[in-house]
Structure formats: C-alpha cells, structure tokens
Amino acid sequence: MKIAWIGVGVMGKSMALNLKKAGHLVYVYNRTLSKCEGLEDDGIKVCSTIKECVNDADAIFTIVGYPKDVEEVYLSDYGIFANAKEGSYIVDMTTSSPALAKKLSEIGTKFHVLDAPVSGGDIGAKNASLSIMVGGEKEDFEYLLPVFEAMGKNIIYLGKAGSGQNCKACNQIAIAGTIAAAAEAMHYAESVGLDGNTVLNAISKGAAGSWQMDNNAPKMLNSDYEPGFFIKHFIKDLKIARDTMESKNEELPVLNKVLELYENIADNGLENEGTQAIIEYYK
C-alpha cells in the first residue's frame, strides 16, 4: 500500500518507520523538514509539500501537535482534503478534539475518514506496541486493521466518528491521576527520609502498581525528564477533556487539579520536558 505520513515528531517518526518495515511504500511530510533527516536512508520518500505527499496515496495518516494544526493540515487550500485522491483512507492519529474528528468526517465525504489516537509514548511507537483507539465506519477500520497492526498491539474499534478521540480523553484522564499520584508518593518517600527506589520496589508490585509507577516513577527519582510525551501536549489533551465535559455542564475535579499542576511547571519553563517532570512541582 502507498501510505502518506504527515508528522514525524517523537512518535510519528517511529510509526512511519514501522510501516516501512511492514512492506508499505511510505511518503512523509513534516512542516520542519529537518526532522525527516535520515528517513530516506531507510527507504522513505521525504516530500516538500502536503500535496506531493498525499496526491496518489492509498492511505494518509497524520499525527501533529494541536487541533489547530489538524485543521490546517486537513482543511487549508494546500491540505489533505484539497489534494488527496477520492476514495483514499484518511486517519488522524493526533490526540485532538472529538468535535473536530466529527467535523472532518462530515466534511470528508469523498474519503474514508477515521480518528485513531494512540497511547504508549515513544517506547510504544518504537516497539510497535501502541494502543490505538479508532472511531469511524467499522468497515473502514477493518480494511486498515493490518496497517494498524504494524504500529500497535491493542487496537480497538470504539464506534462512530469522534469515538476514538473520546476514548483517548478517558485514557488521559486516567493517566493524569496515576502520574500525579506516583509523583506525590515519591515526594512523600524522600521527604520522610526513605530511599525512593526502595519504596518503589516495595509498592509497585501491589495494589499501587501501574504503568506510570513502573515507567515514569524511576525517571522522577533520577530527574530524567527526557520526553516520551511532552508536558505541553499533555496540557493540550487535558484541556480537550475538560472542555468536552464543560460543554455538558460537568466538572472533572481531579483532572482540573492535575492540569493546574502541569500549567504551573510549564510556566516555569518545563513545557518541553516529559510528563514525569511533574515531580518538579514539589521541589
């Protein structure tokens, strides 16, 4: 299959490489072309415009930063809908607004449009072990399932357009609570004079265990803030979930508190660090 890939950031680059390894013909575009460096050595064609990337593709995948970037990539005169061939499969894997996912599906009637945000960070992207949450027409999901399987292990169809994004919001809400709790537990341990790593070994295999405890708590203890997922993007995700619920006149108090913590450390210059840098709030 000829695949166009737009967005080669922390996760997108590895995902495009995994599609190439699976035998697909992959074309990529990124607004900052320097991020595509080295991809041509792996047999991936680097394009200078969206039009060049998508105009003859069978399937088009996007994973960009913010909903405004999604709108530009899809709806501008130089974007996907204006330049993709009719009948192509178009999948947005950005964590974005459920309302925008529905809008793209409604506008893109000449195409097979899916929303398919992912979870698993840079490690999951590299290892092709991502969780992929898909919304849209079920037959379109089934057609692209072998392609999704080149990037992930836990691939779930959720329902109509926007359902993938709503599921991803659930994912980010759950992460917000667990990563904040892990940081607070590590802070407590060190504040009362315990060795953080010893405490982590004691509690991580019981009821307190979680992916965040296994993967991010050790990084917190080592002040290793290399981003598997940027704080600035997590703030964006939490705001999407908050705004969706506020539109229903409902509140998410735990999410709102964690969002406040992340906005605090972002304001102190840490927006480009990994989400584990939440521990810095306590320092």
Language model: regions and residue ranges:
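Rossmann-like NAD(P)(H) cofactor-binding subdomain of soluble oxidoreductases
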Residues: I50-N55, A59, P67-L130
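Conserved beta-strand segments of alpha/beta enzyme cores
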Residues: L25, G43-K45, Y89, H112, ...
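Active-site-proximal catalytic alpha-helix in oxidoreductases
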Residues: A128-G135, K160-V192, S204-N215, H233
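Rossmann-fold dinucleotide-binding core
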Residues: S96-I173
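NAD(P)+-binding Rossmann beta1-loop-alpha1 motif at the extreme N-terminus of oxidoreductases
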Residues: M1-T62, M93-T94, D122
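Interdomain hinge/lid region at the active-site interface
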Residues: G209-E271, T275
